[in-house]
Swiss-Prot record:
Keyword Translocase appears in the UniProt entry: no
Chain positions recorded as substrate binding sites: 69, 89, 121-123
UniProt similarity note: Belongs to the pseudouridine-5'-phosphate glycosidase family.
Gene Ontology CC terms: cytoplasm
Comment on bound cofactor: Binds 1 Mn(2+) ion per subunit.
Record flagged with keyword Metal-binding: yes
Identification of the protein by name: Pseudouridine-5'-phosphate glycosidase
GO MF term set: hydrolase activity, acting on glycosyl bonds; metal ion binding; pseudouridylate synthase activity
EC number: 4.2.1.70
Binding site for Mn(2+): 119
């Protein structure tokens, strides 16, 4: 089994500010290489799907103003229009699956929005049908966490917490929402192999909490979020623009703390994902 780890490109184009986005993208690939894995950042370059962006393509995705944020549904649109596009969790999973990649590391998954509960991320639909190990620091903190967890259960997505039985929420380490716990990479690989054996659809979604030293207290986050939400209400931003807008305002109010935490949880997720990938390769 070739040890390839999928990485998304939306965090480069819309999740982190320039030039931190470029530095982080490069560092994540280097971290994977140190473990014997090959990280492939996925994106669409001028209408062509790329599994493994070059350094120059990463710089372009990070700095261009015309990079579309796409889920699975928009992949054919971006290809037909020959666009530059950054792939979210859903689009990255779909492309990775088509290329026989079985492990994917990301920051936070999308879910049910607090502001508009009809605004539900395509990530949940893709997680429900694509068999892959996805390592994440939890649903993004800006989401309705309980509704998101209910949707994960309804869609029969296998959710486990790595060394935790409490749902992490991206910047925040704990939420008092119970999830099933695993304590080893072998357990995670075994769960995935049973899904393969019995042809069960959907992801093994591994929630890996942000390290203690980089976590943000829930009360502090909620204060920054209220200010950011007020800015959103005063703006005309809708749909796919909501999350990048809120992340930008959170970075402003936290004086960059949320950006630093985002980078650290990404690095932590890549390390854990590579350990899982190495274990999976031994067991197949």
């Amino acid at each position: 089994m070739e040890k390839i780890l999928a990485l998304e490109s939306t965090v480069i184009a819309h999740g982190l500010p320039f030039p931190i986005n470029i530095d982080t993208a490069v560092e994540l690939e280097e971290l994977a290489a140190e473990t014997g894995c090959s990280a492939k950042t996925i994106g669409i370059i001028a209408g062509q799907i790329k599994v493994g962006l070059s350094r120059e393509e990463i710089v372009q995705i990070a700095s261009r103003k015309d990079v579309l944020k796409i889920g699975t549904a928009e992949i054919p649109f971006a290809l037909a229009k020959k666009m530059w596009a950054a792939t979210t969790v859903s689009a990255t999973m779909r492309i990775a699956h088509l290329n026989n990649i079985k492990v994917f590391a990301t920051g936070g998954i999308g879910g049910v929005h607090k502001i508009d509960q009809w605004d539900v991320s395509q990530d949940l639909a893709e997680l429900s049908r694509t068999r892959m190990i996805v390592v994440s620091a939890g649903p993004k903190s800006i989401l309705d966490l309980r509704s998101t967890v209910e949707m994960l259960e309804t869609f029969q997505i296998t959710v486990v917490g790595y060394k935790t039985d409490e749902l992490p929420a991206f910047y925040c380490k704990s939420t008092s929402i119970h999830i099933n716990r695993v304590d080893s990479f072998e357990e995670i690989a075994s769960i995935f192999l049973f899904k393969e054996k019995f042809n069960l659809p959907g992801a093994v979604l591994v929630f890996n909490p942000i390290p203690d030293e980089h976590a943000i207290e829930v009360e502090q986050f909620e204060e920054w979020y209220r200010l950011s939400e007020h800015d959103l209400d005063a703006s005309s931003v809708k749909g796919k623009g909501v999350t990048p807008f809120l992340l930008s305002r959170l970075a402003h109010y936290s004086k960059g703390k949320t950006v630093r935490s985002n980078v650290e949880l990404l690095k932590n997720n890549v390390k854990v994902a590579c350990e899982i990938l190495n274990q999976l390769s031994k067991m197949q």
